[in-house]
């Protein structure tokens, strides 16, 4: 059994146990209604299934922190079924099924350092860096003067993913993307 904490100590990206399953806290909200007891509404992602649920706790409740191994690894390659990662300290290779990565796989780049979460030796989750730099390999050309950032166009990046970018972005440009949302952050000059 893991460590228990008061629900008021919950933080984003914390790992908790709910109904015997490990969850990652995506967001939370302390609610203090005019009448009745305060409560905490938690939006959490099941680390095994990927399902996102909302859980409501009374402010007096405590929660159990999930207890599993976290290892920093580097992405190596995809073999059609699994994504392979290498532990930079030991040289160990770990295969992570595509189902565990889900949509995050579209932002994986060779050599990218990630955190792999293991439950009894089995990979149950992967955390990519919050943002990363990608090269635009395909998009409609931008025109001089197109500096408005509110209008977006699709662009294919070097991992094959398609993201929305401002009109002034051209093929060959390097851009920073939020890997959690897939949103454009900024153009990078290298």
From Swiss-Prot:
Function summary: Involved in peptide bond synthesis. Stimulates efficient translation and peptide-bond synthesis on native or reconstituted 70S ribosomes in vitro. Probably functions indirectly by altering the affinity of the ribosome for aminoacyl-tRNA, thus increasing their reactivity as acceptors for peptidyl transferase.
GO molecular function term, any single one: translation elongation factor activity
Protein name as annotated: Elongation factor P
Keywords: Cytoplasm, Elongation factor, Protein biosynthesis
Any Gene Ontology biological process: peptide biosynthetic process
Entry-linked PANTHER family: ELONGATION FACTOR P, ELONGATION FACTOR P (EF-P) FAMILY PROTEIN
Main location: cytoplasm
SUPFAM superfamilies, A to Z: Nucleic acid-binding proteins, Translation proteins SH3-like domain
Family designation: Belongs to the elongation factor P family.
Compartments (UniProt record): Cytoplasm
Organism expressing this protein natively: Persephonella marina (strain DSM 14350 / EX-H1)
SMART domains in the cross-refs: EFP, Elong-fact-P_C
PROSITE patterns: EFP
CDD domains: S1_EF-P_repeat_1, S1_EF-P_repeat_2
